Regions:
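Catalytic cores of secreted or luminal carbohydrate-active enzymes
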Residues: 715-748
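Active-site cores of enzymes that catalyze phosphoryl transfer or operate on phosphate-rich substrates
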Residues: 174-248, 330-364, 534
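Conserved phosphate/anionic-ligand binding catalytic regions in large, soluble enzymes, centered on
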Residues: 398-405, 483, 527-543, 584-593, ...
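Extended, Lys/Arg-enriched charged tracts that mediate electrostatic binding to polyanionic substrates
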Residues: 124-185, 460-522, 657-658, 666-673, ...
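Acidic/aromatic-lined carbohydrate-recognition and catalytic surfaces
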Residues: 2-216, 222, 254, 264-331
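Short acidic/polar active-site loop segments enriched in Thr and Asp
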Residues: 47, 258, 690
């Protein structure tokens, strides 16, 4: 790798970033591509590049969070040499680098051999030297890891001849190997079983091939939320930590990287222990965590981190620019279209979390109940608490929990905040349980808090400790899937409020509340990130700003919705529901380009200001599948989705519709300008480390991934910034935002 100067030498960037610029590396943005952007980013005024994950990911990965090899820098991005060239270019311009790290999980790739650690476990089972890496319940699977990858039940797959014994070259192993092949899926064959009849051979492996729908009910390895293709890694084991972090730690200690962003710490068994290890091995490098805080929740004080990645800033800034006076008007539109009552978000969240614990996360809740039942069965004083009763109590406690998790470390007294969070959730859960379950609920609360309960001489301490940890891990998954990834896609009062970590039921934030938050931020986490857009936000900051304008003239918005509904009535299919409609119209408004050609300017009545039809259709399909009302990822309703897509495409081609939105944009341009520039300047002058997401230094009304990962035209940004720096006037809102961003970053 090209040698670079370590942080702290003359001319090196500051150890703590002043500002960062997030780059989403991938096939369209390699290390060398990023290096070519360095002169522009230096002129923009940032101090550090903020890179998405760079370790070797699964074939075809577009984001890097599906790591398969912790010992290699991604070949597709340019390998170690490419990263060295980028680091040298950055240092030459006085910029540092921050790296995104994914400790919680690895990919279950196709073919599986790309993840050599997992391949070894599939081949050798619990005897594999890598068995300790993964969070597998070997007893539940009768010594086999469940692999739910089949498109039909195993018997049907065997009968159809779709599962075959093959011989292939497996990278990293000598000579051809016998494998089981199911289309693109390839699995190792256990030694000594190669010559068995196929059906018997399948049964003798250290993995169990199964129909994909079995995964949500019987999966015996912990995964990232409900994503079966991402298997959890046990970094709480120091040997596993060392093996999976050696390369990252070397990049930090050698000065190639100055800081780290830790992905999904709430999935880890002991986040505090993990962060302390990082701090010890990196001499206290700057580390931020992707921690989603609920309300006034703070990062636990024993975490060795400067703070979060900034979701708490992003949603508050959005609400600061929302007019509380517009709520009743927007409520009326939502109710008219969807039937959802004003103030009904709480019930919607509860409903969604119940669906999650009974559906995609049933296997995790079942495993949690098995643990609790084993603890109780082993203790005569607890034995009469039944599996069913424990399951009911755990289910209701998970649904009632109002944050991602309580941080309880086995063997240590729980913190006051953790006790309060669990006990308040139990109080809410009690209302949904038979009174006869009260004692069982009390036992569950004591168990998940790690308190003494049952016999004085407890046995199977390991199970009790595991229960404490696993409850917290499941809590985070239930909250994420139930709230962010379900309820927030169903609630359409003002969709920009349904942001990661957000509180849509608050609707707006007063100036006094913002200043109180900023003062607390400056006092407690002055070096944490302040984000506007991220790769995980549901909408980009400018999309949210544009949608906030709806609250400033809710009456006019209501009339516009009536107008476009009347215009589209002749071709709006009967399958299209109010949820899809309200989402559609708000998305068109939020992504409208304020300075592009409108129907009034175009002779054919078309509009360059409207979102491209394919972008809109792709987004609506994803959002409606996430909502899981009329369609979903696991049970897609193609007729419904096509009806919504047809409405979206025809609406964008209808001059009556685009004309109405163009009029709205003209009449509310100053409100949009104030919101976009106001949010930008407020954030860039607030306490913390200012983060700019790629392309968001200019006006960029993006949507959820993959829309927000589209390539950025850096040549255009470079030319425009040079023109503005030369004294040319800003021609558009995009120019104004670029100018404000650059001036603020340079002042910092």
């Amino acid at each position: 790798m090209t040698a670079v100067s370590p942080a702290g030498t003359p001319g090196a960037p500051p150890r703590v970033p002043v500002s960062t610029y997030r780059l989403q590396l991938g096939p369209d943005l390699t290390f060398d591509d990023a290096a070519r952007q360095v002169p522009y980013l230096a002129s923009l005024g940032v101090t550090h590049l903020y890179l998405s994950p760079v370790l070797q990911a699964a074939p075809g990965s577009t984001h890097g969070y599906d790591v398969v090899d912790h010992t290699r820098i991604s070949d597709e991005l340019g390998g170690r040499e490419g990263l060295g060239r980028l680091a040298a270019a950055a240092r030459g311009a006085g910029l540092g680098m921050v790296l995104d790290v994914v400790p919680n999980h690895m990919a279950v790739p196709t073919p599986a051999w790309h993840n050599r650690a997992l391949w070894s476990v599939l081949e050798e089972g619990s005897d594999s030297p890598y068995a300790r890496w993964f969070d597998v319940d070997w007893s539940a699977g009768e010594g086999a890891v469940l692999m739910p990858v089949l498109g039909a039940r195993l018997g049907d797959v065997l009968a159809a001849g779709e599962l075959v014994l093959d011989e292939v070259e497996v990278p990293g192993t000598p000579g051809p190997r016998r494998v089981l092949r199911y289309y693109d899926h390839v699995f190792p064959v256990r030694a000594g079983t190669e010559d068995l009849p196929l059906a018997e051979l399948v049964e003798r492996q250290h993995y169990r091939l199964a129909y994909w729908r079995v995964g949500d009910e019987e999966l015996n390895y912990r995964r990232f939320f409900d994503v079966g293709s991402l298997v959890a890694v046990r970094v709480e084991d120091e040997e596993v930590f060392d093996a999976t972090h050696a390369l990252v730690l070397d990049l930090v200690t050698s000065g190639v990287v100055d800081g780290l962003r830790i992905d999904h710490p709430d999935g880890l068994a002991d986040p505090a222990q993990y962060l302390q290890r990082l701090a010890d091995r990196t001499d206290g490098a700057w580390v931020v965590v992707e921690k989603i805080l609920a309300g006034e929740e703070q990062v636990p004080p024993d975490w060795a981190t400067v703070g979060t990645t900034g979701y708490d800033v992003a949603w508050r800034l959005q609400q600061l620019f929302v007019d509380p006076g517009g709520r009743s008007g927007l409520d009326a539109v939502m109710t008219r279209l969807t039937g959802a009552p004003p103030g009904g978000l709480g019930a919607l969240v509860e409903e969604a979390k119940r669906e999650v614990v009974a559906g995609p996360l049933y296997a995790e809740v079942h495993r949690l109940t098995d643990l609790a039942a084993a603890v109780c069965h082993d203790d005569p004083r607890l034995r009469d608490h039944t599996w069913r009763g424990l399951h009911q109590c755990l289910r209701e406690l998970l649904v009632a929990f109002d944050r991602y998790r309580a941080y309880v470390v086995p063997g240590t007294p729980p913190r006051h905040e953790a006790v309060r969070a669990v006990e308040e959730a139990a109080e809410r859960a009690r209302a949904y349980l038979d009174p006869q379950r009260a004692e069982t609920l009390a036992v569950v609360v004591d168990l998940v808090l790690g308190r003494e309960v049952g016999s004085a001489g407890r046995r199977r301490e390991a199970r009790r400790d595991e229960l404490v940890v696993r409850f917290q891990q499941v809590c985070g998954a239930v909250t994420a899937k139930g709230v962010e990834d379900t309820a927030f896609y169903r609630w359409t009062e003002l969709v920009s409020l349904c942001e990661v970590g957000g509180e849509p039921d608050r609707f707006s934030l007063g100036v006094h509340d913002w200043h109180a938050f900023a003062q607390r931020f400056a006092a407690l986490t002055p070096h944490a990130l302040t984000a506007g857009s991220t790769h995980d936000t549901k909408r980009g900051e400018d999309t949210r700003a544009a949608l906030g304008v709806l609250s400033e003239d809710a009456g006019a918005w209501s009339r516009l919705v009536d107008e476009v509904r009347a215009a589209t009535a002749p071709y709006r299919g009967v399958l299209v529901d109010g949820l899809a409609e309200n989402l559609l119209w708000q998305t068109v408004a939020g992504t409208w380009l304020p300075d592009a050609v409108t129907p009034d300017d175009a002779p054919d009545g078309t509009s360059e200001a409207a979102i491209a039809p394919d972008r809109l259709v792709d987004y609506l399909r994803k959002a409606l599948r996430e909502a899981k009302v009329a369609t979903s990822w696991t049970s897609p309703d193609e007729a419904y989705e096509e009806a919504v897509a047809e409405l979206a495409r025809r609406a964008l081609a209808d001059p009556a519709v685009t004309g109405a939105f163009a009029r709205w944009a003209r009449e509310h341009r100053e409100e949009l300008r104030a919101a976009s520039l106001g949010i930008t300047l407020t954030r860039l002058t607030a306490p913390g480390v200012a983060d700019v997401y790629q392309g968001a230094e200019s006006y960029a009304p993006t949507l959820v991934d993959p829309d927000n990962r589209r390539p950025v035209d850096v040549d255009d940004l470079t030319e425009r910034l040079a023109r503005l720096d030369g004294g040319a006037p800003a021609r558009t809102l995009a120019d104004e935002k670029l100018l404000v961003t650059a001036r603020a970053l340079r002042v910092r």
